[in-house]
């Protein structure tokens, strides 16, 4: 594993960071932006695609695209813009057996792009992998509940409603053929 990938993983799995991962924290977002925005830019421009040759480097790439995007671009549609690439990388990682070479905490973040997806097929993939790869996770019950809540939102709304204010384009409302104007 290269030094940058190791630095990303060391940062993300540090005990101090664990408490901040899923909370809105502008200071934490700024730390990620300062430390890893350059890496994120390289990842989205395919400069880090060779990281996919090794399981833990692949995980670092997924964290850059899936997790750090949400911190770097909070409240901006760019926060979700790279989810598709992260999912494609995860698909390859699963196919290549990389999950077998990770611990349960690493597997969780490798699979999280499926739950971040607004496509129900990705949620189905996540559930198929959940019991096989995360049943030994100490927070397995909470993870399953968390994922179920996300999946129910997708089934009900076909998207994550909390993203509406960030991602919805209102141009369709001004088209002359729109019956609701």
Regions found by a protein language model. Give the residues of each.
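Structural motif
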Residues: 49-59, 99-105
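Conserved small/polar residues in nucleotide/adenosyl-binding loops
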Residues: 171-177
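Helix-adjacent hinge/juxtasegments
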Residues: 71-101
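Amphipathic alpha-helical regulatory regions
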Residues: 57-68
């Amino acid at each position: 594993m290269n030094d940058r990938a190791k630095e990303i993983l060391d940062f993300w799995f540090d005990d101090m960071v664990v408490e901040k991962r899923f909370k809105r924290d502008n200071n934490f977002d700024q730390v990620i932006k300062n430390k890893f925005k350059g890496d994120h830019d390289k990842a989205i421009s395919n400069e880090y695609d060779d990281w996919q040759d090794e399981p833990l480097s692949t995980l670092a790439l997924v964290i850059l695209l899936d997790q750090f995007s949400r911190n770097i671009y909070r409240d901006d549609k760019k926060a979700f813009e790279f989810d598709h690439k992260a999912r494609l990388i995860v698909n390859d990682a699963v196919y290549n057996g990389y999950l077998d070479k990770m611990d349960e905490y690493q597997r969780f973040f490798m699979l999280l792009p499926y739950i971040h997806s607004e496509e129900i097929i990705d949620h189905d993939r996540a559930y198929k992998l959940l019991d096989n790869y995360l049943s030994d996770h100490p927070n397995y019950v909470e993870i399953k509940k968390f994922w179920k809540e996300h999946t129910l939102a997708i089934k009900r709304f076909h998207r994550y409603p909390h993203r509406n204010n960030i991602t919805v384009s209102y141009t369709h409302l001004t088209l002359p053929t729109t019956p609701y104007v």
